């Protein structure tokens, strides 16, 4: 039986998420890590070099302008867990306003971005990509600012990578994650309501919070 978007959202509500072994594998399996990566929304680490680049950049930040393009960018690597079924499901969730992308543009060219799923005040980050230096870091900084502004309480990164840890992400136990997840899912939040801010404005806001 084919997986439906509603079943996928029920899975997120219980703390599990889907992956495929590789892009050509038609099957999907469920993942429930013993240790979960999260990004504390008030703990984003912005290095001096990233701050300088964001203050000087000509990149534009856009929301949901090319969701499918962001998913394609995330899958455009030698080894990816994003197969055709995952593309299908998340494009449906996007059409239902349950999955969103934050995009980094250079003129008319999409050069980076991140996409994920929203449920209550929880944001489940799925994947990100970069075609310019630090474009994914800029996307994450702008995403953290947007989630804070929209009333989100949980930014789930699934796993803790070295890249995410350098930006302030941490790892918590499954039990700790479940508690935070249930609290976040019970709260309202909005991904689309906050105003769109430039990288320069985001630097100022994050600096004021640190």
UniProtKB/Swiss-Prot annotation:
GO cellular component term of the entry, any: cytoplasm
GO molecular function, one term: leucyl-tRNA--protein transferase activity
Enzyme Commission number(s) of this protein: 2.3.2.6
Species annotation: Roseobacter denitrificans (strain ATCC 33942 / OCh 114)
Family: Belongs to the L/F-transferase family.
Primary enzyme class: transferase
Name the UniProt record assigns to this protein: Leucyl/phenylalanyl-tRNA--protein transferase
Pfam families: Leu_Phe_trans
Catalysed reactions, as listed in the record: N-terminal L-lysyl-[protein] + L-leucyl-tRNA(Leu) = N-terminal L-leucyl-L-lysyl-[protein] + tRNA(Leu) + H(+); N-terminal L-arginyl-[protein] + L-leucyl-tRNA(Leu) = N-terminal L-leucyl-L-arginyl-[protein] + tRNA(Leu) + H(+); L-phenylalanyl-tRNA(Phe) + an N-terminal L-alpha-aminoacyl-[protein] = an N-terminal L-phenylalanyl-L-alpha-aminoacyl-[protein] + tRNA(Phe)
The protein's role, per its UniProt record: Functions in the N-end rule pathway of protein degradation where it conjugates Leu, Phe and, less efficiently, Met from aminoacyl-tRNAs to the N-termini of proteins containing an N-terminal arginine or lysine.
Main subcellular location of this protein, as a coarse class: cytoplasm
Entry keywords, A to Z: Acyltransferase, Cytoplasm, Transferase
UniProt GO BP: protein catabolic process
């Amino acid at each position: 039986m084919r997986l439906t978007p509603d079943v996928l959202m029920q899975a997120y509500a219980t703390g599990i998420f889907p992956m495929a072994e590789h892009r050509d594998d038609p099957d999907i399996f469920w993942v429930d890590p013993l240790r979960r990566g999260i990004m504390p929304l008030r703990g984003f680490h912005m290095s001096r070099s990233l701050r300088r680049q964001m203050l000087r950049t000509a990149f534009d930040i856009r929301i949901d302008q090319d969701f499918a393009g962001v998913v394609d960018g995330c899958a455009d690597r030698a080894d990816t867990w994003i197969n055709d079924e995952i593309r299908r499901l998340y494009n449906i969730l996007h059409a239902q306003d349950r999955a969103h992308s934050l995009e980094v543009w250079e003129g008319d060219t999409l050069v980076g971005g991140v996409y994920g799923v929203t449920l209550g005040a929880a944001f489940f980050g799925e994947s990100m990509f970069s075609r310019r230096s630090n474009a994914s870091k800029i996307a994450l900084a702008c995403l953290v600012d947007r989630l804070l502004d929209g009333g989100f309480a949980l930014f789930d990164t699934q796993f803790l990578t070295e890249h995410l840890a350098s930006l302030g992400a941490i790892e918590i136990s499954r039990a700790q994650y479940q508690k935070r997840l249930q609290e976040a899912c019970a709260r309202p939040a909005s991904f689309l309501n906050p105003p769109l801010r430039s990288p320069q404005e985001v630097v100022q806001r994050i600096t004021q919070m640190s």
